[in-house]
UniProtKB/Swiss-Prot annotation:
Annotated family: Belongs to the DprA/Smf family.
InterPro entries tied to this protein: DprA (IPR003488)
GO biological process: DNA-mediated transformation
Superkingdom of origin organism: Bacteria
Function, in words: May help load RecA onto ssDNA.
Membrane-spanning parts: none
PANTHER family tied to this protein: PROTEIN SMF
Name the record gives this protein: Protein Smf
Length: 314
């Protein structure tokens, strides 16, 4: 109850919520007024905020229990270290299944909702090769490029992680819910920072993209027009110092081409992908036994962002 009550204090940043969580018990925290909170943090807010409704918090707790969702709190052992890199990391994330393994390489494979059949096939192809070589696939579970990336990992019987904009009991979009059980069976996870009963807002999608980039070591965009949400993910990734890749410039969309103009690297073929991962490419799609260490941080440190990965895996 205390955790959910504090997480409902939407006007506070994640680290401020954590400070309340660590220093107040439930009976005391529910007595705090906005003025008390302002005094505690030595700051004032521009407008009055409605404090959490205890009945709503009780209902949220029941949803968490009914869905058997897990909660990772900022600063806890279960909270992903990579996520701590982002601006204002969430106080709590709610998830089903598992969270990404920090010791493994993870790529965000994202793109537009509206993609051609050919681009959908290319997204699956690249994601499949990443997954079967030990790279965990992170994406936003949206229709289009996102779900194609997830499906590729599922088809390879590998782990993939879906970050959703809605709450854990209202997985969005509905048409992709049929993939949830298989995704979870294979050790993946559904992840969100949205609380039960929160009415979805447009900015929730940007918050979702922020988590996608935060959980990833590199970002690969297969198709993105100029107004694609995938560009937000890429820009956030660049802010974190991540490598950003785009598919063939003849097909990847104007938004992805613009990213290339700002330094994103082009990946045209699966062979290009294997070269980035420092793995020998075999035409039969069979990888030599002595090359299957792409998920080891030390083996990829000279290829992508190994130094950063070493830090967050400590």
């Amino acid at each position: 109850m205390k955790l959910l009550y504090i997480d409902n204090l939407k006007f506070l940043k994640g680290k401020e919520k954590l400070k309340l969580f660590n220093n107040f018990d439930f009976n005391n925290v529910i007595k705090l007024t906005q003025k008390d909170i302002e005094s505690y943090f030595l700051k004032s807010f521009r407008r009055l905020f409605k404090l959490p409704d205890l009945k709503l918090v009780e209902l949220q707790e029941k949803v968490i229990q009914r869905t058997k969702a897990k909660v990772a709190i900022l600063g806890s052992k279960s909270y992903p270290n990579k996520l701590k890199r982002i601006y204002d990391p969430p106080f709590a994330i709610y998830y089903k299944g598992n969270l990404p393994d920090c010791s493994l390489l993870s790529w965000a494979v994202v793109g537009s909702r509206k993609i051609s059949k050919t681009l959908a096939e290319r997204t699956r192809e690249f994601s499949s090769h990443l997954a079967k070589n030990g790279v965990e696939i992170i994406s936003g579970f949206a229709i289009g490029a996102d779900i194609e990336a997830h499906i590729a990992a599922i088809n390879e019987n590998k782990r993939t992680f879906a970050v959703i904009p809605t709450d854990i009991d209202n997985i969005y979009p509905r048409q992709n819910r049929k993939y949830v059980s298989k995704l979870l069976e294979q050790g993946g996870g559904i992840i969100t920072e949205t609380l039960p009963f929160d009415k979805i807002q447009n900015y929730f999608f940007a918050k979702r993209n922020r988590l996608v980039s935060g959980l990833s070591d590199a970002i690969f965009i297969t198709y993105a027009p100029l107004k694609s949400g995938a560009l937000i993910t890429a820009e956030l990734g660049l802010d974190l110092g991540l490598d950003v890749y785009v598919y063939d410039l003849d097909f990847c969309g104007d938004g992805a081409v613009k990213l290339h103009d700002f330094g994103a690297q082009e990946i045209k073929t699966v062979k290009d992908l294997y070269a980035l991962l420092n793995i020998k490419y075999v035409d039969s799609n069979n990888i030599e036994d002595d090359s299957k260490e792409c998920c080891n941080c030390k083996n990829v440190s000279d290829v992508l962002i190994g130094e950063l990965l070493k830090e967050v895996c400590k």
